[in-house]
Amino acid sequence: MFAKLQRIHFVGIGGIGMSGIAEVLLNLGYKVSGSDLKPSAVTERLESLGAKVFEGHRASNVEGAEVVVTSSAIDSRNPEVAEAHANHIPVIQRAEMLAELMRLKYGIAIAGMHGKTTTTSMVAAVLAGGELDPTVIVGGRVDAMGSNARLGKSHYLVAEADESDRSFLKLWFIHAVVTNIDREHMDTYHDMEDVERTFVEFMDRVPFYGMVVACNDNEPLRAILPRVRRRIVTYGTTEGSDFLIRCVPCDSEQLLLGFLNRFSVEYRGKSLGEFLLRVPGLHNVRNATAAIAIGVGLDIPADKIRAALAEFRGVDRRFQLKGKANDISVIDDYGHHPTEIRATLAAAKQCGFRHIHVVFQPHRYTRTRDLMDEFASSFGDADSLYLLDIYPASEQPIEGVNTEALARRITEVSGRATFYAKSFQVAAIMAATAAEPGDMILTLGAGNVSQLGPQILERLSAKKVAAE
């Protein structure tokens, strides 16, 4: 590979996409350094593995580095990037480094606008259950790994493929999974036709001996499959899917054991039997079936696939229980797009809570502007809704695009009362006041809303004490 490199430097090493690659490189024996604006649990873990992590971005941080890796969030004005250019140190995107790791491996790339992280984690679990010991790089902390990356001993590498900046077109892989396409990342893509062309190009990167595993339930994806020039295997509840899903209600014993999904799968008319999941929602059944398709393609016995999925415990910030107080569950989820919000709320409804109280933090001004009407119709399964200010994610404000405008639009479209919470403290008070025993409070968004859970739990505990 690039064995002669002495030091690889990551600008923004604490990012979820960057840290996984850095961890694998550390485990391969490379010297790794990096910088981030502030320390975190992620940077502390990397330091424990041997990385040198600098707080803040300074030109001196790249001294001695032989390559500098950046994410799409880092621009050319960054002092470390500028210093690297001035000294002719190669500056590459994280996708180029991931591509180099995948180039000499049996790569499996997981793409799609929604569900990538969970599907990547499930595919990794299936390969591990089949004793294939994969290397894994994923965009979220996986409970079973205790991290977002692991170095396996086999030639298999499972990686999440980032379409947000088209960088997934740089990757090398044998098989690809595509979960869906949607109106997302429209700051990168001109329109849906551009999205479609790019995903067709991605799927055509599969070699002639590989396969594309595609969700047949996503109509926009299904519509472009005839344009793909590679072998395609489909999955879904749609009749005619190669891997056909039949959902079955869990029985009382399975529910007591913590299972939330039960389904059977037929592969081209042949039954693979029933499967159980501990994560809720039809979207997770689809994600699991993508992993089943990969497992079957790699000749992993169905019983080993079944056992691996039954033990799958989920991913950080994907319907993650933060705690319970006064018989009220506080759950956090990364969902920040209308499609994800609808799927998460449907999963919450499946769990049988009395009422669902949602605290939503919109993510990016451009996404809020472009999908305002879609957001307005996404909260139908919520019993109460509290909106925080838009999390900018480095974007500048856009005139007329704000939480108050979104709240008005939701009320116009759905007729539901929507409350603006001007701070985390106010949101915690509102949600905790509304919730009663048997309810759930769901925090939603891709920003820092996950930090709200402890405040809500504190309010709920205080409410219980006051009631006593």
From Swiss-Prot:
Record bears the keyword Transferase: no
Pathway: Cell wall biogenesis; peptidoglycan biosynthesis
Residues binding ATP, per UniProt: 112-118
Domain of life: Bacteria
Protein location: Cytoplasm
GO terms under cellular component: cytoplasm
Catalyzed reactions: UDP-N-acetyl-alpha-D-muramate + L-alanine + ATP = UDP-N-acetyl-alpha-D-muramoyl-L-alanine + ADP + phosphate + H(+)
Gene Ontology MF annotations: ATP binding; UDP-N-acetylmuramate-L-alanine ligase activity
KW Cell division (keyword) present: yes
Pfam families, sorted: Mur_ligase, Mur_ligase_C, Mur_ligase_M
InterPro entries documented for this protein: Mur-like_cat_sf, Mur_ligase_C, Mur_ligase_C_dom_sf, Mur_ligase_cen, Mur_ligase_N, MurCDEF_pg_biosynth, UDP-N-AcMur_Ala_ligase_MurC
Keywords per UniProt: ATP-binding, Cell cycle, Cell division, Cell shape, Cell wall biogenesis/degradation, Cytoplasm, Ligase, Nucleotide-binding, Peptidoglycan synthesis
Any GO BP annotation: peptidoglycan biosynthetic process
Enzyme Commission numbers on file: 6.3.2.8
Protein family per UniProt: Belongs to the MurCDEF family.
Its biological purpose: Cell wall formation.
Name listed for the protein in its UniProt record: UDP-N-acetylmuramate--L-alanine ligase
